[in-house]
Amino acid sequence: MGRRIAVVLFNLGGPDTGNDVQPFLKNLFRDPAIIRAPLPVRWLVARLISTLRAPVVKQNYAMMDAGGGSPLLRETKKQADALQAELAKKLPGDEVRCFIAMRYWHPFTEEAAAEVQKWGADEVVLLPLYPQFSTTTTGSSLSAWHKAYKGKSRTICCYPFEENFVSAHVDQIMAAWERAGRPGNVNLLLSAHGLPESVVKSGDPYQWQCEALAEMIAGRVPADWEVSVCYQSRVGPMKWIGPPTEEEIARISDQGRNILIAPIAFVSEHIETLVELGEEYRLVAEKHGAASYTRVEALGVHPGFISTLTGEVLAALGMKETIRSCAGGRLCPSGWSGCPQAELKQKAGVRITETAG
Ligand SMILES: C=CC1=C(C)c2cc3[nH]c(cc4nc(cc5[nH]c(cc1n2)c(C)c5CCC(=O)O)C(CCC(=O)O)=C4C)c(C)c3C=C
Ligand SMILES: [Fe+2]
Ligand SMILES: [Fe+2]
């Protein structure tokens, strides 16, 4: 008899309705991976920020959905179904089931862990829907998982340089350019979620993974395009990595260029892509005189993305080779023995035959 293989897809989660916005934000700001303060302070800060932020954020959720909720779970379910179908083809002798574990709203990681336990999985593969590794996202999700689930598992760290992943991005970008009427004088902005600078300084590989991915994408789009990386969704008073997406849009729009803007750290449509990239930054571009502004869609169920995820799961099961795209060492959840980050930066994108663990 074949194995029961559970694949757990991790993402941040989002409110189901407008009433969930404040408690969702409170969960987010209570996370020590997001607010690095000791407990009583963190809980107070979480209550304060979530209360202050909720009214504005509620309006943004309401722009996407009449009920005021996030499309993230719906989009993640589509990805889970597509991945499960692909894995069923690749592993015909086994039973594969995809589970969804959200960090700050339903289905919570604890709920997913209980489901996996109940199902009686023989193998558990942990798959973050965050292509780049950050302690604030993947790291936080995995620690919640290990608190909730006591069995063994195999962990995928990150996959920003996987061939199918890079080409899926290029494909989405070129499709958006076609839709925009193939303009000339293009500036492609590759926008990632920002991080506080202190997080990067403490060893988080997220920023260099975003920037190395951006270089790979830049190498495959028309040579006369300007390409730059920028960081969106800054929250709070700390210093964040930059340049900020909004400032880049203003700078480029002032030159009257055609802007294409693509998300490179989000793989599903949600508030940051539909509202921030789709609506708020469009107004900035218009105000500063951009010739045009076109938002590139998130990867969603793009076949290249689903095959990236399929390949990562097979690699985690020891059935395929993959790219080692992370820094290894202290932060790496896959348990790679690690080598100096600088050496790995050079190696990024080099196909190797070692498997994780
Ligand atoms: C204050 C700190 C935050 C850090 C650091 C952060 C990192 C980070 N987040 C994502 C992906 C997503 N973030 C989403 C929502 C969201 N994130 C923060 C704050 C931080 N994120 C807040 C306060 C919110 C809520 C919305 C808001 O108040 O603006 C979402 C889900 C949104 C949805 O539609 O449901 C995702 C996905 C990444 C990739 C990342 C760093 C690597
Ligand atoms: Fe976020
Ligand atoms: Fe890693």
Curated annotation (Swiss-Prot):
CDD domains from the UniProt entry: Ferrochelatase_C (cd00419), Ferrochelatase_N (cd03411)
Q: Which family does it belong to?
A: Belongs to the ferrochelatase family.
**What's a single GO BP term from this record?**
heme biosynthetic process
Provide the protein name. Answer: Ferrochelatase
Q: Which UniProt keywords apply?
A: Cytoplasm, Heme biosynthesis, Iron, Lyase, Metal-binding, Porphyrin biosynthesis
Among the GO molecular function terms of this UniProt record, one is: metal ion binding
Q: In which pathway does it act?
A: Porphyrin-containing compound metabolism; protoheme biosynthesis; protoheme from protoporphyrin-IX: step 1/1
From the Swiss-Prot or TrEMBL record, state where the protein is found.
Cytoplasm
KW Transferase (keyword) present: no
Its Gene Ontology cellular component terms are: cytoplasm
Q: Which Pfam families match?
A: Ferrochelatase
- List of residues binding Fe cation: 193, 272
Top-rank lineage group of the source organism: Bacteria
**InterPro entries in the record, alphabetically?**
Ferrochelatase, Ferrochelatase_AS, Ferrochelatase_C, Ferrochelatase_N
Described purpose of this protein according to its UniProt entry = Catalyzes the ferrous insertion into protoporphyrin IX.
Source organism: Hyphomonas neptunium (strain ATCC 15444)
The chain's disulfide connectivity reads none
Its Enzyme Commission number(s) read 4.98.1.1
**Which reaction(s) are listed as its catalytic activity?**
heme b + 2 H(+) = protoporphyrin IX + Fe(2+)
